[in-house]
Amino acid sequence: MINKHIIGLKITTTNENNQAQEDINQLRKSFYGQSNAELQTFKKEPYTYVVYTNYQGDFQQGNYDCYLGIASESTLTGFASCDIKLEKYQIFDFPYYNPQDTLEARKTIWADQSLKRAYLADLEIYDFEHNRLQIIISTIED
């Protein structure tokens, strides 16, 4: 089971018309600016998380929330937070060297038509120290 409390920044976006790419790039700029320094004291793991949740459709259409942050046991004033609890999910591991790697990893997952997605929450876990990206997709089946 995955059980995480994430604090950081939040946007609502859509993949329609490449809007998410623009919105998430702006979110990253904000996070890695002033916001990241404030959050470091609350960080309980060396990872950075991106959480996609509250899907109003699937990955191709409809709005969803995107959080960029850290795992923490605290909630911090001025920052968004979300709780992720997943019992059924599939894990994908990829090398990570730049933001384009995330898009290529997502394309690989989106192309997998056997994946039975639940659209509860999906996570990207960035391990910058080891150049790894782990993507966790909520599924209907194990």
Predicted regions span which residues?
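A solvent-exposed interaction/effector surface
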Residues: M1-D142
